[in-house]
């Protein structure tokens, strides 16, 4: 078995090396074209020099559309190292009837001519047809023989391995193929190119990527976290999930082979990132705080709402179960949108809510009943757990607000001052459940009329009694009312307005869930 594996590896290295030497073509420059040159502020056409790391290969690419037989070029230019472009001297699209045609190749100006040549069909040349070149029979022969030999060795080795493993139970949990990827608007749209890692989390990492002329976010899950990927896809695919304050879903895909699979979730990209990242680097004004808090509450209220009779079906109530500032993203105008539904529960009539295991989420944001393991497994109980965490996120906003007449604290996570950055479950139980502590509301916040009302609202969100917490809809109304009242306060009538504020009828304190 060991000798066979070594032989296979040696032959594989030889064949790969010979193939690379024979087929590799250095790309220094490519034909450049941009149909949207005025909007992108680039040249319309020209020659583009290709730059990149010395150990990376460079390619040319072309994208175009076929509109009723008329060829419209979208873009041409340089393309970064892509295994799908290796050793292609001609720029040919082989996919069957894509919406956007895409091809890539190696060699200077190789994208000057491009064509559409679907497999099993007759070539449909574009306005710039490629002149076919004579086949390289010798290269094919030298490449195929070692490949066939490798395939035979691998098949034999695999058969011996399986025969040997049948007698022994597996020690590790086997990697499972998630099956065919779900229907996705991205299947057939190229190119999608990963650019840089923006964040890492419990279930994978988030990349900034480029899809044709726009940036998108790609969340990549390892196969071990298939359940989280599947759950997030299912939640995004529910009827009525398109909302201004819920992260826009674009598609889901499976990438890689059956042995090495990554699961991709593609969403809108927001340059400002998460609320947590934003607050680390910025303070907020009172109006900015109100806008972020109100749009955040709107998103959660919509998520919690059960909405029958939509055009595309019935939207069930959904509990997020991992509300935190890292899972709230900010658009350029500071409008908030809720993200990350890997742990979410949907409450559909006549169906199980799925895995309702109580102690999930991020420890420092866990409600007292979650830390105690004393959850009532009903819909309203899960929605109230979200509201406790929302109270902590509002505290994070308040701690970085400049409205009050006092110093603005350095950004800290909830309970970081009391427990530190890496609390254990026992630490959280001691502070939250037994001592019933909450993050500190500064005394000088009470001197600002709006901040004083916000502090009262925060306390009603994180109330130890779950049934006394505000609902998300009530929270949104409170914040709207706070902003309206504080906006009319002036230097001349501040005493009058403060008197009015004390007589305002707030929405009921009890949860309306």
Curated annotation (Swiss-Prot):
- Where does this protein hold ATP? 198-206, 219
Question: Which keywords label this protein?
Answer: ATP-binding, Cell membrane, Disulfide bond, Glycoprotein, Kinase, Magnesium, Manganese, Membrane, Metal-binding, Nucleotide-binding, Receptor, Serine/threonine-protein kinase, Signal, Transferase, Transmembrane, Transmembrane helix
Domain annotation Protein kinase: ranges: 192-485
As cofactor, the record names: Mg(2+); Mn(2+)
Q: What is its EC number?
A: 2.7.11.30
Q: Any ranges marked Cytoplasmic in the topology annotation, and which?
A: 162-513
InterPro entries referenced in this protein's UniProt entry, alphabetically? Activin_recp, Kinase-like_dom_sf, Prot_kinase_dom, Ser/Thr_kinase_AS, Snake_toxin-like_sf, TGFB_receptor
Would you indicate the residue range of the signal peptide?
1-19
Query: Which SUPFAM superfamilies would you find in this protein's record?
Result: Protein kinase-like (PK-like), Snake toxin-like
> Would you name any one GO CC term?
cell surface
Gene3D superfamilies xref list = CD59, Phosphorylase Kinase, domain 1, Transferase(Phosphotransferase) domain 1
Instruction: Tell me which residues are glycosylated.
Output: 43, 66
Which top-rank group of organisms is this from?
Answer: Eukaryota
Q: Which GO terms describe its biological process?
A: activin receptor signaling pathway; adrenal gland development; anterior/posterior pattern specification; autophagy; BMP signaling pathway; cellular response to BMP stimulus; cellular response to growth factor stimulus; cellular response to oxygen-glucose deprivation
Disulphide bridges: 30-60, 50-78, 85-104, 91-103, 105-110
Looking at the Swiss-Prot or TrEMBL record, what is one Pfam family this protein matches? Activin_recp
Stretches in topological domain Extracellular: 20-135
Q: How does it sit in the membrane?
A: Single-pass type I membrane protein
Where in or outside the cell it occurs: the entry states: Cell membrane
Q: Does the keyword Nucleotide-binding apply?
A: yes
GO molecular function annotation: activin binding; activin receptor activity; activin receptor activity, type I; activin receptor activity, type II; ATP binding; BMP receptor activity; coreceptor activity; growth factor binding
Q: Which reaction does it catalyse?
A: L-threonyl-[receptor-protein] + ATP = O-phospho-L-threonyl-[receptor-protein] + ADP + H(+); L-seryl-[receptor-protein] + ATP = O-phospho-L-seryl-[receptor-protein] + ADP + H(+)
Protein role:
On ligand binding, forms a receptor complex consisting of two type II and two type I transmembrane serine/threonine kinases. Type II receptors phosphorylate and activate type I receptors which autophosphorylate, then bind and activate SMAD transcriptional regulators. Receptor for activin A, activin B and inhibin A. Mediates induction of adipogenesis by GDF6.
Against PANTHER family, the record matches this protein to:
ACTIVIN RECEPTOR TYPE-2A, TRANSFORMING GROWTH FACTOR-BETA RECEPTOR TYPE I AND II
Q: Which family does it belong to?
A: Belongs to the protein kinase superfamily. TKL Ser/Thr protein kinase family. TGFB receptor subfamily.
Q: What is this protein called?
A: Activin receptor type-2A
Source organism per entry reads Rattus norvegicus (Rat)
